[in-house]
């Protein structure tokens, strides 16, 4: 008699396996091992049924109890000739589903129970009998193992998975053989040919892709791509892996381009052309802070080529070195020291401004490799002589920058020769006499400290003009208030020397004297006669040095009180050379004084 639970689990009324009933039977066998024989006998009887449906349900129940139950079930199945019954059913060509189910179960069991050397060799014997009959076993299905199953149930799923993986690997290797270096090179050659043909095909012409050669090349590239993927996943050689990855990227790019053209999307081809035709950026960036000034011109560094004016053919972006006024540097201010080469450098100042009378003390550049010269001028004759003072003729007009030194007229008189550095004497008188100064005193707002001696470091003077003015008084040198030209003085040798000072109009500087000329002053003080009567005072010379440095004209005289100076950016005066005549220094002090008029104090301060 069949066990009632087995009867219900294998009823022909069921549409499919009743998994709840099957698991209930497994639990019963695990808790009541005495019912194992009765359950196995009932399954054997249900296999002899003529209904294929019942046979399938009986085989499913048998598979479930062997998988989830213990060793007792395995032994009962092997001893009750259930395996022999199943072999007979497979040989009689039953229903295809029943036969396939029997073959799968016998193959799985013989592998799980370790073949002929296992604990139950009956399973392996059944497997060998079917093989001798020429029956081909199907692919093994995957069975999920149970957590409570012992030995055979644990090894069964693992072995089935390994067998399936081996079968998949074998089929893959047969379908995609491993690539070699030669095949990789062949693949690249095919890619090059296909790329050239695709470049020759118009993006809008889809018919060109339907050519037999193109279709064949695309098919080969796709096959190589699959083989490359298999190579990357299976190889352990690093060099082959790198070559495979590079080939895979190239194949992917080429096939994507083919698909884009086939779908009508020719943007890829247009983008490649646009990349080749994009011109360089013509935007120029000029770094004003890092520009260099060379010879008065600004050099701006740009990264692009020059632009040419099509009409004139001139380069209008590159600065011209000859035109230094085109660009003005915006960096730090240029030093006030004179430049070495006045290449078209023009400095404009307001000649009528009152600020021109402000005293300026030029500073030397400590980093320049020039000699630092400091000139302190004095008469050098002891306390009986007074240091000369120089004042301009008014603050509204520009003053000619001069350097006045004091030296004796001739070494033949026994006076001390001229020296560039003398300490100024403290006495303000000539021989103890009080001399009246006709020049205007300095205004209080332009007072300068006596200690601030103007120093100057000459760099590269362009021209040096020296004018020696011989006088007999301490009267400061000034312009002739009467008009354009001063009076010339005739010495004993009848040599005429003079200076031409035209009236200053429009804020322009009058031209200075000739080079190395000696001019005698035409303004004398009546007090000088006492000097000739009381004591013989040697005539005095004032050396006027004018140094022209291209952009500036600086006063380096010894007047520390209040020299009226123009700015360092005053345009240089034009020099007008005169005919040089020899001077008789022996009788230079004998001058006819009746021909000259002394200037009044009221007119001394006006132009």
Curated annotation (Swiss-Prot):
Q: Name one GO cellular component term.
A: cytoplasm
Write out the annotated subcellular location.
Answer: Membrane
Q: Cross-referenced InterPro entries, in alphabetical order? A: ENTH_VHS, GAT_dom, GAT_sf, TOL_plant, VHS_dom
Q: Where is the composition biased (Low complexity)?
A: 448-460
Name its species.
Arabidopsis thaliana
Q: Locate the Phosphoserine modifications and list their residues.
A: 297, 410
CDD domains the UniProt entry points to: GAT_GGA-like_plant, VHS
Supply the SMART domains for this chain.
VHS
Identify the domain of life. Eukaryota
Which residues belong to any copy of the GAT domain? 175-263
The UniProt keyword set, sorted, is: Membrane, Phosphoprotein, Protein transport, Transport
Entry's Gene Ontology BP terms: protein transport to vacuole involved in ubiquitin-dependent protein catabolic process via the multivesicular body sorting pathway
Protein name (database record): TOM1-like protein 8
Task: Give the similarity note.
Answer: Belongs to the TOM1 family.
Q: Which Pfam families match?
A: GAT, VHS
